[in-house]
Curated annotation (Swiss-Prot):
EC number: 4.3.1.29
Broad class of enzyme this protein falls into: lyase
Stated name of the protein: D-glucosaminate-6-phosphate ammonia lyase
Keywords tagged on the record: Lyase, Pyridoxal phosphate
Induction line: By D-glucosaminate and DgaR.
Coiled-coil spans in chain: none
Length: 369
């Protein structure tokens, strides 16, 4: 097998069965998207005009009034928060992230206060926001959301993520209704979501996506929504967004990646994964089945349960050996403490699932020696 470019640099080969994670480079970009990126990198353009044109093109896919491409989804959160606080006023933009004396509170659910590799609160603070949590970790009510709003409130933030608490939380409809009743912008962090239109259609004012996750774009993100608020986002380029700027090549790459996505993506079904699950279950001490994404997306994964008493190793041991081999195999490890890890097929290249099964078999055989 021909070494990839990272192996040529002296780094390990990685099999990514973890999903579209930043720590592993997020996603694999299609050749035609990279070709567009290369062409964009080799020419000059008026950046302001490119910002407007790419915003228009992105909005064709989202159904929004306008859009603004960012360097990543995390930058999008900071920029959207700054937009909500400053309303695009140049004097205020120049002061950010110092929002002293401004309405700067961002109201969110405690069950949505997550860490995706960095705390979401870091991005909010970077945009000048002060976090106001609503509810408890496992339950939030409409009256709690309403009572958190005052003259210092700048925006409401709704986070849609598999990291969030999935039960006992308020719905997007609750947030839309409360935001509109109080004439406040609603920001939705939909970084890894695949539905380009639903969140805008729900009534959100600024919806943030990662370009590199669901859409397999080069490193990028975008904010899509109401024209007045997107204009306020664009104004941040003369403030905090300058340190988060994205290059012309990745702006073009995102547009081409969205076109690819719009034309249709191949998905791995539960039925297609079943033979792999059966092969893993044939290994002593391992039991595999198929699970759907915890946030309800149409994503199917193989869940592997480790019987430590049978195998002689616990789930943490197996995951560590997968990662520590000659080929580093990364699995999803959110449930390791429950004796479970998962394999996400979306980022596994052809032939690599067989290598994963073979490595699991090897680990089990060595444990039996």
């Amino acid at each position: 097998m021909t070494p990839n470019i990272y192996q040529q640099l002296g780094l390990k080969k990685v099999i990514n069965a973890c999903g579209k994670m930043t720590i592993l480079g997020v996603s694999s970009v299609a050749p035609e998207v990279m070709q567009a990126t290369a062409r964009a990198a080799s020419a000059f353009v008026e950046i302001d005009a490119l910002v407007e044109k790419t915003g228009e093109l992105v909005s064709r896919y989202t159904g929004a009034e306008d859009s603004y491409i960012t360097s990543c989804a995390s930058a999008g959160i900071a920029i959207a928060v700054a937009a909500a606080i400053t309303h695009g006023d140049r004097a205020r933009v120049a002061l950010m992230p110092d929002s002293s004396g401004m309405a700067n509170e961002v109201v969110m659910l405690r069950g949505h206060n997550v860490d995706y590799g960095a705390p979401v609160t870091s991005a909010i603070r970077l945009g000048g926001g002060r976090i106001v949590e609503v509810g408890s970790s496992n339950l939030a009510t409409r009256w709690q959301l309403e009572s958190a709003i005052n003259e210092k409130t700048a925006a409401l933030l709704y986070v849609k993520s598999h990291h969030c608490v999935q039960k006992g939380m308020l719905s997007i409809d609750d947030f839309v209704q409360v935001a509109q009743a109080n004439h406040l912008p609603l920001i939705v962090d939909a970084a890894a979501e695949e539905d380009l239109r639903g969140w805008v259609a729900s009534g959100a004012d600024m919806v943030i996506y990662s370009g590199a996750k669901a859409f397999n774009a080069p490193t990028s993100g975008f904010i899509t929504g109401r024209k007045t608020w997107i204009a306020a986002c664009k104004a941040q380029h003369q403030g905090i967004a300058r340190a988060m700027k994205i290059g012309k090549e990745n702006m073009v790459g995102l547009v081409y990646a969205l076109e690819n996505y719009h034309q249709g993506q191949t998905t791995v079904t539960a039925a297609q994964l079943q033979p792999v699950a059966e092969a893993i279950s044939a290994i002593h001490g391992l039991y595999a089945d198929i699970e759907q994404d915890e946030a309800g997306r149409a994503i199917w994964r193989i869940r592997v349960r480790v019987n430590a008493s049978e195998l002689g190793l616990n789930a943490q041991d197996v995951e560590a050996q997968l990662r520590g081999g000659e080929i580093a195999i990364y699995a999803r490890k959110y449930q390791l403490h429950q004796g479970v890890f998962s394999l996400d097929p979306r980022t596994v290249a052809e032939g690599e699932m067989a290598l994963i099964v073979a490595r699991l078999r090897e680990i089990a055989e060595h444990a039996a020696d």
